[in-house]
Design a protein with these regions (language model features):
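Phosphate/dinucleotide-binding and metal-coordinating scaffold of catalytic cores
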Residues: 1-190
């Protein structure tokens, strides 16, 4: 399904790693991850993946808990076509010149589509890169992530940015794009 350059853009290789799971596998594996309390936060169900390889075997994705370099969002029963909608929205954001993370649709072993994105808070070796979000910069706890305003965020950007005017323009472009595409989840952690 992948054009070689598209594979290289997100996976660093023209050969796309195998996603050897089916939707049924993912449901079981997700339950195990939840029981082990190593889940990624957020509204949508998601799993952390990394690429593993061994001699004479193709690269493949494995579920790794919190520290993977990729995030996988499978289809859900409640909201059909969420992976397709998220990928389309990210492509529209790119066309609107909004900076986005590397992303794509990928097929499970049974052919079902899932959304995959590369984490920007990890190095190529999977080491954590320090990043701050607006909760941290506004000194709010995560449980108060919905208790902010666009005005407050703009003021924080003006206070901490090394290029505040450019960053505030970029921020407002993201706000307008989110409004146009119906993204109502732009809280202080996003």
């Amino acid at each position: 399904d992948f054009h070689p350059q598209c594979g290289k853009k997100i996976f660093g290789s023209k050969t796309v790693p195998l996603l050897p799971y089916t939707k049924a596998d993912i449901k079981q594996l997700a339950e195990q991850v939840i029981r082990s309390q190593t889940t990624l936060t957020g509204v949508q169900a998601k799993l952390s993946l990394d690429i593993s390889s061994s001699p004479n075997q193709p690269q493949r994705f494995t579920i790794v808990g919190l520290w993977g370099r990729y995030i996988l969002k499978p289809q859900t029963e409640q909201f059909k076509y969420m992976p397709e909608v998220e990928d389309l929205t990210m492509h529209l954001a790119e066309l609107a010149k909004v900076n986005v993370v590397p992303h794509s649709l990928i097929r499970f072993a049974d052919g079902e589509l899932a959304y995959i994105t590369k984490r920007i808070d990890r190095t190529a070796k999977g080491e954590k890169l320090p990043m701050e979000d607006m909760c941290q910069l506004s000194e709010r706890l995560t449980e108060y992530k919905y208790k902010g305003s666009y005005e407050k965020i703009a003021k924080i950007i003006m206070q901490y940015s090394s290029v505040p005017k450019l960053d505030v323009i970029n921020f407002w472009e993201q706000v307008v794009f989110s409004w146009l595409t119906g993204n109502a989840d732009m809280h202080l952690k996003n």
